[in-house]
């Protein structure tokens, strides 16, 4: 399974040092997680970084009313992380839940920080990941500020149509800021 991660590194980093790639791979161990497993509990400090080899997960938080608000659905070849907790070293409300049988490569954050101090390839890889996350989040932010629920749904339809077929619509509704009933109406209008 580390072959998938190694391929991912080579796609994301131009001419990575093979020694540095091996160092990166060495801090990760493979873990099989069942549907419903929690990779990171809410209101905790993240202790590990994951790379989703196959399967899927979602990040969510619970609002003041007790409703789960899905932030994102993460699919294979992506990192599992809570950037708020990683960046601040503090507790964050984000929960990372596994949505189906998944294989995750896991590294303890102590080893991640240590490797980031000395491995240029890993630095580039993580910088690229954070840059990509920032772009996605900014696009979503602008859509929430300027767009309608219908436009947010259309964006998911265009960028991640498999999400609509594969996962409960309550997650999608939550991601675009509507109720499941409102999402049904939007879908019927299409």
Feature annotation, model-predicted:
Residues 1-29, 85:
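Cyclic nucleotide-binding regulatory module and flanking cytosolic helices
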Residues 70-127:
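Cyclic-nucleotide recognition modules
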Residues 29, 56-61, 79, 103-104:
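Short beta-strand segments in beta-sandwich/barrel cores
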Residues 34, 53-54, 75, 100:
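A cytosolic small-molecule/anion-sensing beta-strand core signal
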Residues 47-58, 76-77:
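Glycine- and acidic-residue-biased ligand/ion/polar-headgroup-sensing regions
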Residues 147-190:
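Phosphate-/nucleic-acid-contacting segments
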Residues 39-44:
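Short phosphate-coordinating micro-motif centered on Lys-Gly-acidic
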Residues 6, 133-142:
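Short, Lys/Arg-enriched N-terminal segment that forms or immediately precedes the first helix
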């Amino acid at each position: 399974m580390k072959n998938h991660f190694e391929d991912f590194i080579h796609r994301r980093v131009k001419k990575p040092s093979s020694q540095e790639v091996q160092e990166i791979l060495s801090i990760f161990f493979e873990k099989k997680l069942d549907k419903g497993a929690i990779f990171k509990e809410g209101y905790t400090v993240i202790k590990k970084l994951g790379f989703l080899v196959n399967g899927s997960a979602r990040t969510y938080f619970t609002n003041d009313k007790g409703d789960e608000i899905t932030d994102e659905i993460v699919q294979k070849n992506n990192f599992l992380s809570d950037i708020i907790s990683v960046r601040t070293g503090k507790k964050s409300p984000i929960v990372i839940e596994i949505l189906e049988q998944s294989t995750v490569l896991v590294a303890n954050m102590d080893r991640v920080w240590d490797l980031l101090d000395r491995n240029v390839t890993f630095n580039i890889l993580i910088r690229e990941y954070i840059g990509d996350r920032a772009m996605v989040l900014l696009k979503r932010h602008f859509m929430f500020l300027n767009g309608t629920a219908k436009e947010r749904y259309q964006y998911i339809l265009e960028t991640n149509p498999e999400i609509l077929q594969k996962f409960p619509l309550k997650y999608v509704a939550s991601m675009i800021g509507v109720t499941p009933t409102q999402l049904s109406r939007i879908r019927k209008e299409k």
